[in-house]
Design a protein with these regions (language model features):
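Short, structured "edge-of-domain" segments at secondary-structure transitions
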Residues: 2-259
Length: 259
């Protein structure tokens, strides 16, 4: 629940794509057991935007970005977490967008960010979704209220994924129980990630054994029903599972190809 500020040139440049990289504890004063959740380019955002945070226990918080303009080298508390809770997602929002939250047991909720009042940096936050016993949040994203081209991509630990139009997720009130988003079976395993995507995006899948697979979002058909398991997106080695995914926006892919 802490925030740090770091200049890009302070991160050592990797020799190649396959390099191990530099441990974050060597560039940031992270506490034992602390890990980075989200990175935001401060040069690309304006003073009138917010940081919207979502935790594993379903707590949400909206704070003006100006609260984090003057960050000490040692960092600042961004949100006061309950014991055992972890920050899952941090997104930049405009104040009039919708928030989508997805859980491990296949539940999702969409609500207006205006349902969450602006809070000071030291605040705890409020309930974003009412979780069932044993459930936790695994992903969250931002949707424009009038956007028709966005989709929601859900993937399970065994590599089963599906893509739905964002319009399939109807607006609810903050703090509700949500609705069924994914059919979990012994074959699929639990949900590990829920992300907002677009047709021209790519997804980078990272497995527990360190395998990296990159595929086009267009390879996954858009489904009408939400409460389904989807299709096998990638074949993993026996015993391996999906650990996490990263969405690569289409605009960044075009920049790569131009280079």
């Amino acid at each position: 629940g802490r925030t740090y500020r770091l200049k890009a040139y302070e991160v050592p440049e990797a020799g190649s794509r396959n390099s191990r990289g530099t441990a974050m504890v060597n560039v940031l004063p992270l506490a034992v057991g602390e890990s980075v959740t989200t990175m935001i380019d401060l040069e690309r955002i304006h003073e009138d935007v917010n940081l919207f945070m979502v935790t594993e226990f379903g707590v949400v918080k909206r704070t003006a970005i100006e609260e984090y303009r003057n960050i000490r080298r040692s960092g600042l508390n961004a949100i006061n977490l309950d014991e055992g809770d972890h920050l899952i997602s941090v997104n930049v929002t405009t104040g009039n967008q919708d928030i989508l939250i997805g859980t491990k047991l296949g539940i999702a909720i969409r609500f207006s960010e205006s349902d969450v009042r602006l809070m000071k940096r030291a605040a705890h936050g409020v309930r974003g979704i009412k979780l069932n016993t044993g459930d936790v949040v695994v992903g969250a994203g931002v949707l424009n209220a009038d956007e028709s081209e966005a989709q929601v991509f859900t993937i399970s630990e065994e590599g089963f994924g599906k893509r739905n139009d964002a319009e399939a997720y109807t607006l609810q009130k903050r703090g509700g129980k949500g609705s069924k988003n994914f059919k979990i079976t012994n074959k699929t395993g639990d949900v590990v990630a829920v992300e907002v995507v677009h047709n021209d995006d790519e997804v980078m899948l990272i497995s527990e054994q360190g395998k990296i697979i990159r595929f086009n979002m267009n390879d996954i058909a858009v489904k009408k029903g939400k409460a389904i398991s989807g299709v096998k997106t990638q074949n993993l080695d026996e015993g391996d599972k999906v650990a996490s995914i990263a969405v690569i926006p289409g605009a960044e892919i075009e920049d790569e190809e131009a280079e």
